[in-house]
Regions:
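Proline-enriched interdomain boundary motifs that mark the N-terminal boundary
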Residues: 285-294
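Surface-exposed, short loops/turns at beta-strand junctions within beta-sandwich domains
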Residues: 342-351
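Extracellular fibronectin type III
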Residues: 360-375
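Aromatic/hydrophobic beta-strand junction motif of beta-rich domains
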Residues: 302-308
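A domain-level signal for the mature, folded cores of soluble proteins
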Residues: 1-139, 151-286
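Aromatic sugar-binding surface patches on proteins
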Residues: 335-341
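Conserved structural position at the C-terminal beta-strand
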Residues: 355-357
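Beta-strand signatures of extracellular beta-sandwich domains
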Residues: 315-319
Length: 375
């Protein structure tokens, strides 16, 4: 087999974010190396915090100080200021724009490339104040490719929540100028992975993946079969617990806690079951139309006038024009068809601004775009 790192670099996905996305895939160390998280037992006993807490401190059976690992152990955020802390982690070049790659053979000895993506927070950002579900600390998603005997991709499988979707390599959209690079359209807030841009009906909600955000070629952190040890740590990457909401979920286990870690073919089976179940889904309702917006600059703020019939909430996102930064977002409830909201910009640069409306059911619209001129 060709060196795993070479194969993983050759076919690493280009992550195409939604225009309103606030959380980008980064090193798993964004969850251990900063002072905002704690490793603790299920009863709340704190075991470690940074700088003692690090990826190297984690293991399948014992921690770096010799204490035993328990399956109920959790790394959780202390302040819940997810936006600020994720932004601080992303600002550090050592941590931002990473995927964790692994070459693994399945139970039929077919070779797969797995790309595990870690996100600081899972936030559907449908309308913030309207929905209490669909949000959790930590988010592991993945893309995997099956290679043939000549080590060329033949099948791609993308995770989508608890489901997955599979396509032959010939039907996968590639990056311009590179037939080796699959495009992965990342859904707003949920980070589900799609083969095409647009609004995707899951049977319960819409995932919006408009593909109008930054396009990132991440660096690959190479993983082995059961190494580094943090990858098979059995604890929880976040302390969020699901409620009765149909869009809610627990924080996830790490890569080694997923069945496809041991046998990549199992995810292809999930994709087959997902396709079969899709026929029984209820018909997709009409998604709300995007708001009509007009933006003016008032010093270090953007004033957004909107017209959004029947909207109950509005999400507004800004990033410096032309940058590859995650968006900064605010979510506000609204009443009436028309109104204004203000967004802090922070400096004199030009900004791109995107706005999405949500209806009373929490379904979010596609984004409307505008440019805030420099001051």
């Amino acid at each position: 087999m060709t060196d795993a790192k070479l194969l993983l670099e050759r076919h690493k996905p280009r992550l195409v974010y939604d225009s309103l996305e606030a959380y980008f895939a980064g090193s798993a160390a964004i969850w251990t190396d900063f002072p905002y998280t704690r490793l603790r037992r299920a009863d709340g006993t704190v075991l470690a915090a940074a700088p003692q807490l690090s990826l190297a401190f984690l293991g399948p059976h014992a921690y770096g100080d010799g204490r035993p690992v328990r399956a109920g152990d959790v790394i959780g955020e202390t302040s819940r200021d997810y936006k600020q802390h994720a932004a601080e982690a992303h600002a550090n070049v050592r941590y931002r724009n990473r995927v964790h790659g692994r070459a693994r053979r399945d139970d039929q000895q077919r070779l797969w490339l797995q790309y595990w993506c870690f996100y600081y927070y899972n936030d559907f950002q449908l309308a913030g104040p309207l929905l209490s579900g669909g949000k959790h600390e930590g988010d592991w998603e993945m893309v995997q490719l099956r290679l043939d005997a000549a080590e060329r991709p033949v099948v791609a499988v993308y995770t989508q929540h608890k489901a997955a979707e599979s396509r032959p390599w010939s039907a996968v959209e590639k990056a311009p100028g590179s037939q080796d690079t699959p495009l992965v359209y990342v859904a707003r807030g949920s980070h589900a992975n799609y083969f095409t841009p647009g609004a995707h009906w899951t049977g319960v909600w819409f995932d919006n993946a408009d593909g109008r955000g930054p396009r990132i070629d991440p660096a690959v952190v190479v993983l082995g079969d059961n190494s580094p040890a943090w990858a098979v740590w059995p604890g929880w990457w976040g302390d969020t617990k699901a409620t009765s909401s149909p869009i809610d979920a627990n924080s996830p286990r790490g890569p080694g806690g997923h069945r496809q870690w041991g046998n990549p073919a199992l995810l292809a089976g999930v994709a087959a079951r997902t396709a079969a179940a899709a026929a029984a889904r209820p018909a997709a309702p009409a998604s709300p139309p995007p708001p009509v917006i007009a933006v003016r600059r008032d010093g270090d703020r953007a004033v957004v006038a909107f017209d959004a019939p029947d909207a109950k909430g509005l999400v507004v996102a800004v990033r410096p024009a032309g940058s590859d930064e995650p968006a900064r977002t605010i979510s506000v409830p609204v009443s009436g068809t028309k109104g204004e909201v203000e967004v802090e910009l922070g400096d004199d640069r030009a900004f791109e601004l995107h706005a999405s409306a949500a209806d009373g059911n929490g379904a979010a619209s596609a984004g409307a775009a505008a440019v805030v001129p420099e001051r």
